Amino acid sequence: MRKAIRLQQPIAVNLSFGNNYGPHDGRSLFENYISELNGVWKNMIVVAAGNEGNARHHTQVALPKGDFRIYGNGGFDGSRINSDNSTEVEFALAEGERALTIQLWKSYVDRLELYVVSPSGERFRMPEEGTGVRYMLGGDSTLSIVHGTPTPYTISQEIYMEWTAGEGVTLPAGIWSIALYPREIREGVCNLWMSGIEASGSQTGFLMPVTNTTLTIPATADRIVSVGAYQADTMAVAPFSGRGFTASGQTAPTLVAPGVDILTAAPGGGYARRTGTSIAAPFVTGAAALLMEWGIVRGNDVELYGEKGKAYLMRGAKPLPGITDYPDVAAGYGRLCVEQSIPK
């Protein structure tokens, strides 16, 4: 970005990476930083939507609204829980795993109790707000739970869980669960994200996954172009492509581009076929560069960058077969079309 400013030239930035850590609502420090870059100079930032669409690494639960606290003669009894309205989130931990993280994100106004339950039935309680605790699982393996607080950048609250295997052993495999006991619920929505596919095995995942809001961060940032992948020969969105919308309801992905079995330059020379949204995003980054060249460099529209360029790409996107309502959680506004994106 600094070099583009020094050269007084527009710049298209491609970010073909992402992870699951954060509230996915555009409000984390990282998401805000990426969004703010939009106003630094004449640029367009393009971000891959991630490959978590069918990875079973996201789920969502809705807790019943109301006051479920237990009261005694002396008032509210914080040591007791009401199990009548409890919710369990189950997930499979595959053989051979050495590390796993799960984040639960919820509204700070909601109060609940959380227990992690092992395959053997052992229960591990969430600590007090603003603190953390580490439990021993055997073989020097540990489970850490951190009960977070809001930050200056987000009103959401995180409960962070991390499993770490001891030296020479793996984590206890089987069906684990996260038991949620509501105390005082006003909004009730809890989103849980697991480590991304690079960090966990393919057999590890939630038993009741939710494919929506599986975009990786920073594809959830506000003022960027987020790109999913579709298969060119079938004209269908790729199953792995990260789905929207964001946790705050913002439209993402913006659009989709070819991302299955794409012939591309290989490290060390030559060519190879690659699949993923990180392959789809460069198509859109190139399109963004062409739009800014047409507008800024050639003098047709010196303000064609940032959100204006994004708007042109959205309008120019073509529909995909079988999808009638746009924006769509998987395809956004449709598939990339550079020709239709250039204003006539």
Q: At which residue positions do the language-model features occur?
A:
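Catalytic-core environment of secreted peptidases
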Residues: 120-128, 229-282, 318, 340
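Subtilisin-like serine protease catalytic core
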Residues: 6-9, 26, 40-42, 55-57, ...
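Noncatalytic accessory or regulatory domains flanking protease catalytic cores in secreted, cell-surface
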Residues: 18-23, 127-188
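Acidic, Ser/Thr/Pro-rich low-complexity intrinsically disordered segments
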Residues: 84, 94-98, 104-133, 331-332
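Edge beta-strands of jelly-roll/beta-sandwich modules across compartments, strongly enriched
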Residues: 186-197
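Secreted peptidase-domain scaffold signal
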Residues: 39-40, 55-110, 338-344
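Short acidic, glycine-rich surface-loop motifs adjacent to enzyme active sites
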Residues: 1-27, 48-49, 181-183, 296
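Hydrolase catalytic cores
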Residues: 1-9, 101-102, 111-113, 117-120, ...
